[in-house]
Amino acid sequence: MTQFTHINASGEANMVDVSAKAETVREARAEAFVHMAPETLQLIVSGQHHKGDVFATARIAGIQAAKKTWDLIPLCHPLLLSKVEVQLEAIEAENKVRIESVCKLAGKTGVEMEALTAASVAALTIYDMCKAVQKDMVIGQVRLLEKTGGKSGHFKAES
């Protein structure tokens, strides 16, 4: 069984030492969904939401969150991200918004947590902006879709 990398021999949490690792190009994609009432989704899609452009705000929030992941998650390394992209798509037939994030860098540690944080915070921002009109929205299925680079190689989630 693979060992947890953030726990030392005494069972204490610690930050992994990556100083001896080689720099490689690393990329990760993650997704999240926000399920809502058709009326709420229509407010977003039509641009009629009283707080403004929900997707633009969520996109910027996701990008900012990726850059702050090291500050939010205690054992994450501060990273010099070379790319953060957050795409939002209204899926009207299913009354939900799909968020996909991509993070990339050339470095010694992966960007999975940054991609997951970007998608999660974008989803939270949608909730925050729309909670006045609907409080029972559901944020769900936050997951890593794919990652490349590094010692563990390529990972792709099953559809």
Curated annotation (Swiss-Prot):
InterPro entries: MoaC, MoaC_bact/euk, MoaC_sf, MoCo_biosynth_MoaA/MoaC, Mopterin_CF_biosynth-C_dom. The active site is at D128. SUPFAM superfamilies: Molybdenum cofactor biosynthesis protein C, MoaC. Its EC number is 4.6.1.17. The keyword Lyase applies. GO terms for biological process: Mo-molybdopterin cofactor biosynthetic process. It catalyses: (8S)-3',8-cyclo-7,8-dihydroguanosine 5'-triphosphate = cyclic pyranopterin phosphate + diphosphate. It comes from the Bacteria. Substrate binds at L75, C76, H77, M113, E114. Keywords: Lyase, Molybdenum cofactor biosynthesis. GO terms for molecular function: cyclic pyranopterin monophosphate synthase activity; GTP 3',8'-cyclase activity. Pathway: Cofactor biosynthesis; molybdopterin biosynthesis. Belongs to the MoaC family. PANTHER family: MOLYBDENUM COFACTOR BIOSYNTHESIS PROTEIN 1 (PTHR22960:SF0), MOLYBDOPTERIN COFACTOR SYNTHESIS PROTEIN A (PTHR22960). HAMAP family: MoaC_B. Catalyzes the conversion of (8S)-3',8-cyclo-7,8-dihydroguanosine 5'-triphosphate to cyclic pyranopterin monophosphate (cPMP). Homohexamer; trimer of dimers. This is Cyclic pyranopterin monophosphate synthase. It comes from Vibrio parahaemolyticus serotype O3:K6 (strain RIMD 2210633). The gene is moaC.
